[in-house]
Every structure is written in structure tokens, then in C-alpha cells.
Amino acid sequence: MLKLLRNNGINKLKSNLIRNYSTKQSIFQALDTFPKRHIGPNENEINEMLKSINTSKLSKKNPNSLEQLIEYTIPKDIRLNRELNIEENKVIGENQLLKDLKKIAEKNKVYRSFIGMGYYGTITPHVIQRNILENPGWYTPYTPYQAEISQGRLESLLNFQTMVSEFTGLPMSNASLLDEATAAAEAMQMCVNISKSKGPFAFLVDKYCHPQTIDTIKTRAEPKGIRIEVVDSKDFKFTEDVVGCIVQYPSSNGVITDYKEMADRAHQANALVVAATDLLSLALLKPPGEWGADIALGNSQRFGVPLGFGGPHAAFFSTKDKYARLLPGRIIGVSKDKQGNSAFRMALQTREQHIRREKATSNICTSQALLANMSAMYAVYHGQQGIKDIANAVHRKAIILAEGIKRLGYTVLDRPFFDTVLIITGDKTDMMIKELESRQINVRQYCSKSISISLDETVTSADISALLNGFSAHASKPLGLSSPEQLEKETSTISVISEEFARQTPFLTHPIFNRYHSEHELLRYIHKLQKKDLGLTTAMIPLGSCTMKLNATTEMYPVSWPEFNSIHPFVPANQSLGYKEMFESISNMLCEVTGFDGCSLQPNAGSQGEYAGLMVIRSYLTSIGQSQRNVCLIPVSAHGTNPASAAMVGMKVVVVDCDTNGNIDVADLKAKAEKHKDTLAALMITYPSTHGVFEEGANDICDIIHANGGQVYMDGANMNAQVGLCRPGDIGADVCHLNLHKTFCIPHGGGGPGMGPICVKSHLAPFLPGHSVVKGVGGERAMSAVSAGPWGSSSILPITYVYLKLMGGQGLKKATQVAILNANYMASRLKDHYKILYTGSHGLVAHEFIIDLRMFKESAGIEAEDVAKRLQDMNFHGPTMSWPVPNTLMIEPTESESKYELDRLCDALILIREEIREIETGKADRKNNVLVNSPHTEKVIVADNWNYPYSRSKAAFPTPATVASKFWPTVGRIDNVHGDKNLVCSCPPLSDYQ
């Protein structure tokens, strides 16, 4: 009987298991699906959080559900009433998607490319690839605004600045810009700003600059009314209106030119000289600063950063000390902390757009930190002698190639060169290019009668042989010597860089560049710096308007595939079919997400997306005979890049007021739109608002602008609250940029890379940016380029592709719902301790919210900075400080954070509120307390002397999580004023590192 019962029980259990499983899914359905990994809270936690918010008090319909939460958060008239159609919209596992993407990637042909033009093959040291590029400890941190927990990458970026300054011979460098072409455009604007003239302005461009650089300069100049003259530099005429000029050094055709006489003439006419240059060549060539350049810029890509089909790469930019305050981009400087220790920080931040808005030096608010750090580590690893050896090897290989080609009967341009050989091919040009392509070799067709070949550190003897064999197929003479090794011996005494061009000054002299040349030493240095920085590997980073969500390993994985990262951006179209397929897929998915009709992937950052979007609007208005429209309405709450971008495209900024609830004052908007109805070009609006609320009447706001002849530009900074729930195009916007490094999972990289593609309505699509080198990019009436690369930072687009495909329409919607849930859950937990500054009509927030700290300045002498620094003691990065409202904190948790992590931050903030109360009640001293003295470093805690009126444990281990695992700020609170008054922007003495 017992046996019978047991068998019956087993059979029943089997039956239930089979029945339960079969009702859920097929056994062939993927089990490694992504949404459950990307979204932090599980279903039980979601239900628990919904109950704590208790939306059922608003309605009994769908009580305490995500649907009900959204119903009372997003206005009904803009909600999307269908699922997003993300292509096939099928559930797919992570493993299978990578297999599918690999098949697409394999449609790209990885040929040997000797095209040059600012992009070169390079060897990324594996220790740098694995431990920086592929390391979440380096790619997940945010921009180092919280310097005390960012000392590692700040040190590395200071190394980058020092490297650039020493190579270029100019003492002041920034921490990188987006690409060489946009850096050149920034240099032009800097020349205008330095001139202090009211115009008119002219800028001279050497015709031997890279064509993509010339194109981008023209784009930037046109709306500002700057006259551009493209001529040979020897024909530069420095008339009274000329504020500056730019030359390529070495030239795009490879020639090394002596520019000293030209620079002297420029300075006599009060014009500045800009040199677009190549870092590796400067190991052998006289630095631009020594022959008279005032500004030097270029691409640091060949210092260990893969080609990536155009990016991302870190541009460099250096100038003279006296122009420091007009330098675009971020500058890393040295200051002191509260204990007098040397500390790194971002210097001269008052130049930036979040403070100076339309009067800022530039609209760029990001850099290429991750790539700059790779290039800096490349220099640290190789040092002066290593870089010289690489440069000499590249140069000697170019000499060998030139000699071999001469012996085949071809004419080689007889001018000094570094790495680029220009061959006169006459009527054989097309034939030669096809011949070489048949041998899987790409070269540059310089013009109809010549070919140029640019060599790099990856070139082997076999590559030289392949090139010579290719040329021998159509040579007038037989190949006398087939061995590059023999040519090496016979050309050993040939030098094409004369003494007048040769570098005499040392570089990379600081000990930091002479210590870490073994892999063990560099590995330890990289990890030593990494441990100083708080990234998403340590804790959530709750920065409002920054969307610090998961950067999943599966998303990052394809970035290192050679099919994506080893392709030159200017290869023939038939060699990049995989990229083409992926670009089209991403563009279609982004258009579906936003409700638009056209997409450009070219802008390299959100700021560039704003600039591109406004330029598209400007091009459209000009096409319909409305070029007089130049007024841009911008709410007072807007991010500083908005007015800075509007100013860049020649628009006049008119500020629109906000009401007491933080919403756009519709009456003021209507009045100003009607006042400027004949000149209104655009409204720039962020949605949901920068105050973290879905404003009512967004459709009406768009209608007001359209009724008065303007276009609506929507800033996509807060798109993480819209995806799958509402769409900018449906709301009434005409153009929107998307921060792929926020909403669509590209990592922030400690301050870049970013990507800011734009999506547009059909009437604007014809004007999407094109490219001077690669045809077929952009719309039918394409404006000129806004970036160096045709598709921006192409090699990080697989990250967004993988995210969109793995999430699908339902997953994307769920992610947005949970992002809004997480913010509302935190707000509900904190509302009894802090004032939540803005909420919607139902008391709910969007995906972020602001806590008000203004009252504590009077009651306890505590400000937002004190709370943010105290959070560092509790293993957290502080939220966004004092923006958009002074002395507040804006918190954005994102959908990727678990309930555990949300509670940990809430508990920390509640504990801080108790610490403030201790000051308010007199229990703690107003000027000597745990908040104003924060953060507390390990060095302070273990010191023999302890002169604080609270315990060491309260200072450093205030929460259970800090007892279990402690992240230590490396330095105490930094003296920003001291750093700006005593500006030091290159590596300090070695003793400061120890």
C-alpha cells in the first residue's frame, strides 16, 4: 500500500511538473532572456514597492499595478496605446543574439587599410584592452564631478594632458574632445573669442587639411557668419578680418611643411595659428608650439585605440597658458584637499555651459575619457623611447615602400614625409586601386592622378611585399628586389626628415612615463587607479538627468570584435555591409521608439545632437524661404547645453519662465511665441521636464510653436521615462536627440564616449547631415557634416543594437515602467524626511525627483555639497547637485537598480537627515560635524590624532553596508578655489602620487 501511494504521488508530481511547465513555455524557448537581468527588482519586489506607493488610493482600476502607476504619472493624451514594434519583436536569448550579430559582423570585410586621413592601424596592448577598455571598473563611472571618489581616472586624464602638452610644445591641454574635426571647429571659434572683435570674421583653411575637417569647419562657420577661405597655406592673406588659420602637420597628402614664416605673418596681423597634427609624428618632428602654433589639435587614436569604423576616439587640444579660460572641453587640474594633500579635480568649471549657458566657451559637456585614458596608458607603457622606436619604425617602413615603388617606375612625390607616401599613378589610378582591393588592400585615391599610402605600427614585411606586388602588376619596370628586408638595408642611410624639421626637445619626461614599462607594473598601476574610483561596480550612481543604468556584459562584448573595431571609416561600401545592416536596423528601431521618420547616427554626443538638430531646423527653414527665423525659446530650467547649442547655430535665445510647480509657464510661452512669430525658429524642451515631472499640455505647447511658424526640438536627456510609454513624435516634436550613453546603455566611460543621434519628422529628413568623403550619408539635401566620422562613433553602436534587440518592445516598456516605479518608491520613502520639490498632479514623479535641502542652510549650516560628500562615506556617489534648482539633489535610480540598493540609498539619506537634526538640536556642532568634514579618508581615520567631536566609526562606518564592505574616498574634500587660483594642469612631482 505504501509503495502504491508513493508511486501515485510520484506520478502525480510528474504530471503536475509537466502540466505546469507546458503552460509556461516551450522547452526550446531561450532561458537566457535579458529583461529579467537588466531590470533590477524582481516581481515580488515590484509588487512590494507598488504597495508602498499605494496608487490604489487614486483608483480601484488595476490596483497597485505598473499600469496604474503609469496611468497617474503620464498624461493620457500622450500615452502610447500599443506595443513598440522592435523589428521581429521576438524573445531571444543573449547567447543566440551574439551569434546572430556575429553573422552580421562577418559581412564586414577586414582588409588591410592604408588610407590614413587621421585614422591608422594600431596595436592595443592587451593589458590595456582587457583592463581598461573591457573593464567595468573603468567604463561604468560617471564624469568626475565628485572628485574625491574619482582620483584614479583624474590622474590618468592628467597624464593624457601632460602627454599632449609635451608632444605639441604647448603648455595647456584639455582632457580630450570628441574627434579631430569638431576639435578644429572649436579651435576656429576659440580664435574668434580670443580676437574680442565684433566682426566680421574670417578663418583661413589650408587646402591640404583632411577633407572631413574642412567640411566640419564649414558647418560650424556658416551660421556664425564666419568667412572660410580654403587655399594653399603659402597663399594665406591675413586681411584685417582674419582671426586665425589652420594647417595640417604633416599635411593630408603626407608632406611635412615649414610653417614658421606663415606663422610669423599671422602673428604680425594679430591672427592665431592652429595646427591639426599627428601625435606619433611629433616623436620625430618639431612640435607645433616651437614653430609658432597657438593651438594644436588632432586625434590620439593611433595611441592604442582601435579604428572602430570612425570612433570613438579621443581628440586632443592644447594651447598657450594665457588662453586657458577660453579652452573648450574639460580641464583636469591639481589642487589640495582639506588635509593639505595634493588632489586632482576638474578645473575652471565656470567656463562650462551649465553655468554660462549661451555664453559658454563651447556647448560640449562631455569628452572621450575612456579613450583618452587608453591613449595615456599607451604612452605610460611605451615611454619616450618606446614611442620613438614606433615612430622611427613607421617612418622607415614608409621610406622602404617609397623606394620600392620608385624602382617599379612610379613617380613618388619628392617632399619630406613621415608615414604617408604619395604616388603619381596618372591614368592607372583606378586600375591600381582595383588591383590592390583585389589583394584585400585599401589605399587612398588622393586625386584622379595619384594614390597615397599611410603606414602605421601594425605594418609587417608581408604588408610591404603585398603593396609592392600590387604595384608591380602594372609597373613600367620589373620588380628588382622583392624583399623588404633587402630594401631596408639599402635605404638605411636615406633620411627624408631634414634637421630643420627634426625634433630636438625631449618628451614624456615625467617619471610617470618612465616607470611602468613592464606588464606587471602597468597592470598594478591600472588597478591602483581603478580602486580610487566609484563606478557601477561598487554602487548605484543616482545622478539625476544622467541615467546611470546597467551596461551589460553581453552588450559590451561585440565592441572588441575585429569585424567592428578594425575597419577604417573610409573603406569602400562593399566592405562594410555588416555595419550598413546594423545602422539601418538601429535607425529603424530608434524611429519606432521616438515616433519619427528619419535618423542620423553621426552626432558624437548629446551636445552634438542638439547642434545637429538645430542645424537641420535651420536648413529646413532656409529651404522654405524663412531664413530670417532665428529666435529659439528655451525654458529657464533647461540644461545649459540647450542655450549654448542655440548660440552655436546663430540663434538668439529667449528665455521662457517656469511656474511655481516647475512647469513651463504656458502663458509666458504663448506671449513670447506670438511676439516673435515672424522670427521664431524653435522651442527647445526637455520631456519629462528637468524637474522630473510629466507636464500636462505638452501637445498644446507644441501647437503654440507650430502656430507661430517654429519647430519643436525635444532634448532626449529624459528619454528613459518615455520609451514604450509615449513618443516625442506623437507629442508634437519635430526633432529629438537621443543620448545612447544614457537611455540605450552605452557606458559613460568616466566622462565619455557619448553618442547623440537625432531622429526627425519627414519634412526635416532631407537635411540630415552628410559627409564629404563617404557619399550617400544623410538626406537628399544633406547639410554638411557635424562629425569627423560618417556615422559618429560607430564601433559602440553594437551596444545599443544588442540592448534594443534583447529587450524587445515589451521589455523596453517594462524597463521604463520600473524606472518610474523606482523613482516613486524612493520618493515615497524619503518624503517624510525631505521635501520632494516637484510632483505631478497626482503626487507622483517621473523617473527622477528633486529633494529640497535649502532650508538646512539656515537651520544647520548644511548645503547640498555636504550631503553629497557625506554619501561618499556611505559607499555612494552623490546625486546631481544644485541643478536645476540650487541647493537641491536630483535623484535618478534607473530601472537596473534592485530594491536592496534603492533601500540602501534611502537608508543613507534618512540617516543623514538624522545627522542634520543633531546639528539643528545642538547635539552636534554647527561648524565641526560629520557632514561638513566629509568625506573621511582612510588616512584620516587611522591617524594617531583624532580631533573630531564624533567617533571614528560614525565617520567611516555609519551603515551596516560600510561595515561589511568599505569604499574609501582617496582624498578629503577638495579646495576648488585654490585649484582655480593656482592652475596646474600637468603631472605634479612624483611625491604627490605616493
From Swiss-Prot:
Residues annotated with N6-(pyridoxal phosphate)lysine modification: 742
EC code(s) of this entry: 1.4.4.2
Cofactor: pyridoxal 5'-phosphate
SUPFAM superfamilies from the UniProt entry: PLP-dependent transferases
Protein family membership: Belongs to the GcvP family.
Chain's role: The glycine cleavage system catalyzes the degradation of glycine. The P protein binds the alpha-amino group of glycine through its pyridoxal phosphate cofactor; CO(2) is released and the remaining methylamine moiety is then transferred to the lipoamide cofactor of the H protein.
Chemical reaction(s) catalysed: N(6)-[(R)-lipoyl]-L-lysyl-[glycine-cleavage complex H protein] + glycine + H(+) = N(6)-[(R)-S(8)-aminomethyldihydrolipoyl]-L-lysyl-[glycine-cleavage complex H protein] + CO2
Source organism of the structure: Dictyostelium discoideum (Social amoeba)
GO molecular function annotations of the record: glycine binding; glycine dehydrogenase (decarboxylating) activity; pyridoxal phosphate binding
This protein's record includes keyword Metal-binding: no
Record's protein name: Glycine dehydrogenase (decarboxylating), mitochondrial
One of the protein's GO biological processes: glycine decarboxylation via glycine cleavage system
Assembly, per entry: Homodimer. The glycine cleavage system is composed of four proteins: P, T, L and H.
Alphabetized UniProt keyword annotations: Mitochondrion, Oxidoreductase, Pyridoxal phosphate, Transit peptide
Domain of life the protein comes from: Eukaryota
InterPro entries in alphabetical order: EF_Hand_1_Ca_BS (IPR018247), GcvP (IPR003437), GDC-P_C (IPR049316), GDC-P_N (IPR049315), GDC_P (IPR020581), PyrdxlP-dep_Trfase (IPR015424), PyrdxlP-dep_Trfase_major (IPR015421), PyrdxlP-dep_Trfase_small (IPR015422)
Location(s) in or outside the cell: Mitochondrion
Single GO cellular component term: glycine cleavage complex
Transit peptide region: 1-21
